[in-house]
Amino acid sequence: MFFKFMNYKKWLTKNTRTLSGKTVAISGSTGGIGKELCKFFCSLSADIILIDRNKARSDALKESLLEEFPNISLKAYYVDLENISAVRELAKALQNETIDYLVLNAGAYKIPRRKGENGFENAFNINFVSPYILADALLPKIKARGGKLIAVGSIAHNYSKIDVNDVDFATRKAPSKIYGNAKRYLMYSLWSLDEYRDTVNVAHPGIAVTNITSHYPKLIYAIIKYPMKIIFMNPKKASLSILYALFTETKKNEWIGPRIFDVWGLPRKKTLKTCSQEEAEKISELSKEIYLK
């Protein structure tokens, strides 16, 4: 198993296909996993639309990709996912693009906390509300083109259940629960869209050493950084589950992630039993209300 995983290029040949003539839009493209996904997409001849907050980093990535893959078409949009009004404007703009695949990869873990214009905390807006807005706007066209929307979930979704009296976990202190709550909303709200069952896939990278794992205090991070690199996957290998989601079908409540304890190895499909039908229906109901705020 381990040996096979190290030869992931063979896995790529077997489990992916050309994306020539297709366009992939990806949020959070400048992060560790985002960059690797962009390289994979370009190597499969896809055209790319980058969706990022930091213009300088996005432009640098764009330049790097075009240098390595000069024949692709590449556009960039800049938006802060905390800014709900800006995200709604972006959603309108993207409806004028031809998009076959949308990868909702952007996320934020431990960040300075503040309320957004819709009354919800920024981590909730970044990890759930903004991706949901983009999904709502683009799913009809993606479905019509026979494409896929890939929502990047997290094993953190299982750290707690939703609280209807504290939707965005504003009273909680643990970043893992705040982040996990938002991912729980994202995953189960999209799974509830039965008319898009064949269009929506949820995938997760397991645990990888990226910017999202650098939230620990500097001293602790300095100590654990290198052991983490040995124990967990690098961004390139962690991104394979998300890449695979473009090319496979899943059932409701089935996600794609590393096969060994959900943190290591080649991608596999797994049915989640982490949310009751009653809670899933409540997430669907609340998601529609949140979207309108």
Task: Give residue ranges: language-model regions.
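Rossmann-fold NAD(P)H-dependent dehydrogenase/reductase core
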Residues: 2-214, 290-293
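A structural signal for well-ordered alpha-helical scaffolds and beta->alpha junctions
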Residues: 131, 183-186, 235-238, 280, ...
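C-terminal tail/cap regions
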Residues: 2-4, 220-221, 250-293
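Residue-level preference for long, well-ordered alpha-helices that form the structural scaffold
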Residues: 120, 127, 178, 182, ...
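Generic recognition of well-ordered alpha-helical segments
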Residues: 192, 241-244, 286
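C-terminal helical subdomain
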Residues: 87, 226-267, 277
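Short, flexible, mixed-charge acidic loops at enzyme active sites
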Residues: 162-167, 215-219, 257-262
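A glycine/serine/threonine-rich, flexible loop-to-helix segment
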Residues: 209-226
